[in-house]
C-alpha cells in the first residue's frame, strides 16, 4: 500500500516545500488540506493551486468559517475563555478544528500519515499531535520542522535544488498566525522584552490614540450566545466579523503579554482580537446580571480551567468535555442586552437589561421603595463572622501564653 501523507497546508514557504520533501522522505503521495478560518489575505483558490504545483496529488480547501465560529468561538465565549486572564485562545481553538478535518481527509483519501509544520518549541505541536492521537491513533505523525531541524534556509535550499515552484519574498522577522477570532505575532525584535511593539505589527486594529468618535454597540444574548447587534439578527460569524471591524477601528483588543507556554518556556506574544475581547467582555457582563453568586464564583474557576485545557491541547479530552457540559448548564438564563462603548482601545459596559435578571431594584435601592429588611442584617453579620471571631480569640489567647 502506498503511503499517503495528509498535510496541514498553509500556502507558505515551509508547507509548500514540505510537499515534495514528505513525498521524497516517505516514498508516498501528499494530500494538502487548507482551512479557511476567516484569516483573509490570499485567495484560497490560489493556495489550493499552489499545493498542486508543488506536487500534491490532491489539494483540498475547506470553508470552515461558520463551523469555527459556531463550534469553537462560541464555546470560548460561554467559557469566557482567557488563558492567564488575557489571551482569548486565538490559535489554540483553531488547531482542534484543523485536526478534525485532517483526520477526516485521511479517512476519505487513504491517508496513512499526517503532517504539520510546527517546531519543537511551541504549543501547536502538542495541540496537533494530541488531537491526532485522540481522534485516530493509527495515523503516523511527521513533523519536519521539529524532527528534521527544518529551517527557512534549509527550506529555500531544498526548493532550489528540487525546482519547487515557490516565490521567495523577503523573510519576515515575525511569526504570524491569524483567523477570524484574532491575530498572533511573535519572535523577531519582540523577543527582547524591553522593545515596544511597532505600528507596522498591527493589521486588525487601528492606533487607539487616533481619536475616533466613540462607538456605542448593543449586543443581544440568548442562552449565552450573541444573536443580535444593535437589534439586527446576526450569525455567530457575522457577530465576530462586525465587532472586529468596529472594535478594530477603535484600537480595541491589542494585547502584549509574556505567556507561559505548555513546553515550559516563557514567550512574549502580541495579539489583536477586537471581536473576541468585545464579545467576552459583554458575555461576562451578562452573566453578572443573570447568574447567582455562588454559581458565578464557581464558574470563574471552571472558566480558568477550561482555558488551560484548551491552551494545553486537550480540546478532545474527557475533562474538557465535562467542563463543557457544566458551562452549558449555566447558560440557560444568560439572556438579554449589554450596551458597550468602544473608544480609544477600551471596551466599557454602560448598560444591562434582561428578563432573567437577578438584580432587584427594590432590594438594591437606598431610596424610597427599599424592600430590603435591614433588621435581618445584624444577625447575619454575627453568624457570618462567628468562626473567624472564635479562631482569632484562640490565637490571641495562645499568644498571651
Curated annotation (Swiss-Prot):
MF term (GO), any: ATP binding
Residues holding L-aspartate: 119, 123-124
Sequence positions that bind L-citrulline: 87, 123, 127, 175, 259, 271
The protein's Enzyme Commission number: 6.3.4.5
Keywords assigned by UniProt, alphabetized: Amino-acid biosynthesis, Arginine biosynthesis, ATP-binding, Cytoplasm, Ligase, Nucleotide-binding
Superkingdom in the source lineage: Bacteria
Recorded catalytic activity of this chain's protein: L-citrulline + L-aspartate + ATP = 2-(N(omega)-L-arginino)succinate + AMP + diphosphate + H(+)
Main location: cytoplasm
One Pfam family named in its UniProt record: Arginosuc_syn_C
Binding sites annotated in the UniProt record for ATP: 8-16, 117
Subcellular locations according to the entry: Cytoplasm
Pathway connected to this protein: Amino-acid biosynthesis; L-arginine biosynthesis; L-arginine from L-ornithine and carbamoyl phosphate: step 2/3
The keyword Amino-acid biosynthesis belongs to this UniProt entry's keyword annotation: yes
HAMAP family according to UniProt: Arg_succ_synth_type1 (MF_00005)
PANTHER family per the UniProt record, alphabetical: ARGININOSUCCINATE SYNTHASE
Listed name of the protein: Argininosuccinate synthase
UniProt source species: Corynebacterium efficiens (strain DSM 44549 / YS-314 / AJ 12310 / JCM 11189 / NBRC 100395)
Lineage, opening ranks: Bacteria, Bacillati, Actinomycetota, Actinomycetes, Mycobacteriales
Amino acid at each position: 500500500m502506498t503511503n499517503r501523507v495528509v498535510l496541514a497546508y498553509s500556502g507558505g514557504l515551509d508547507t509548500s516545500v514540505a510537499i515534495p520533501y514528505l513525498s521524497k522522505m516517505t516514498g508516498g503521495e501528499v494530500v494538502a488540506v487548507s482551512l479557511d478560518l476567516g484569516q483573509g489575505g490570499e485567495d484560497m483558490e490560489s493556495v489550493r493551486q499552489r499545493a498542486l504545483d508543488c506536487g500534491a496529488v490532491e489539494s483540498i480547501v475547506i470553508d470552515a468559517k461558520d463551523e469555527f465560529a459556531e463550534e469553537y468561538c462560541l464555546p470560548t465565549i460561554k467559557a469566557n475563555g482567557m488563558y492567564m486572564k488575557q489571551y482569548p485562545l486565538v490559535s489554540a481553538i483553531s488547531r482542534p478544528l484543523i485536526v478534525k478535518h485532517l483526520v477526516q481527509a485521511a479517512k476519505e483519501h487513504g491517508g496513512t500519515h499526517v503532517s504539520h509544520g510546527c517546531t519543537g518549541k511551541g504549543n501547536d505541536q502538542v495541540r496537533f499531535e494530541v488531537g491526532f492521537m485522540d481522534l485516530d491513533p493509527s495515523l503516523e505523525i511527521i513533523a519536519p520542522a521539529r524532527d528534521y531541524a527544518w529551517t527557512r534556509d534549509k527550506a529555500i535550499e531544498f526548493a532550489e535544488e528540487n525546482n519547487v515552484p515557490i516565490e521567495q519574498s523577503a523573510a519576515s522577522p515575525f511569526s504570524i498566525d491569524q483567523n477570524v477570532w484574532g491575530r498572533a505575532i511573535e519572535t523577531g525584535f519582540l523577543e527582547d522584552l524591553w522593545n515596544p511593539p511597532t505600528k507596522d505589527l498591527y493589521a486588525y486594529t487601528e492606533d487607539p490614540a487616533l481619536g475616533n468618535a466613540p462607538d456605542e454597540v448593543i449586543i443581544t444574548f440568548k442562552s449565552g450566545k450573541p444573536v443580535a447587534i444593535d437589534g439586527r439578527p446576526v450569525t455567530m460569524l457575522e457577530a465576530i466579523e462586525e465587532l472586529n471591524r468596529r472594535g478594530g477601528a477603535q484600537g480595541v483588543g491589542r494585547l502584549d503579554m509574556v505567556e507561559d507556554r505548555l513546553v515550559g518556556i516563557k514567550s512574549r506574544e502580541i495579539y489583536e482580537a477586537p471581536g473576541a475581547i468585545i464579545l467576552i467582555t459583554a458575555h461576562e457582563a451578562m452573566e453578572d446580571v443573570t447568574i447567582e453568586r455562588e454559581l458565578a464564583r464557581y464558574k470563574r474557576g471552571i472558566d480558568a480551567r477550561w482555558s488551560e485545557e484548551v491552551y494545553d491541547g486537550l480540546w478532545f479530552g474527557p475533562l474538557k468535555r465535562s467542563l463543557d457540559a457544566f458551562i452549558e448548564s449555566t447558560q440557560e438564563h444568560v439572556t438579554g442586552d449589554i450596551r458597550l462603548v468602544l473608544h480609544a482601545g477600551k471596551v466599557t459596559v454602560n448598560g444591562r437589561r434582561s428578563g432573567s435578571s437577578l438584580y432587584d431594584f427594590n432590594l438594591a435601592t437606598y431610596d424610597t421603595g427599599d424592600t430590603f429588611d435591614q433588621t435581618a442584617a445584624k444577625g447575619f453579620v454575627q453568624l457570618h463572622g462567628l468562626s473567624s471571631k472564635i479562631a482569632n480569640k484562640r490565637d490571641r489567647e495562645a499568644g498571651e501564653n
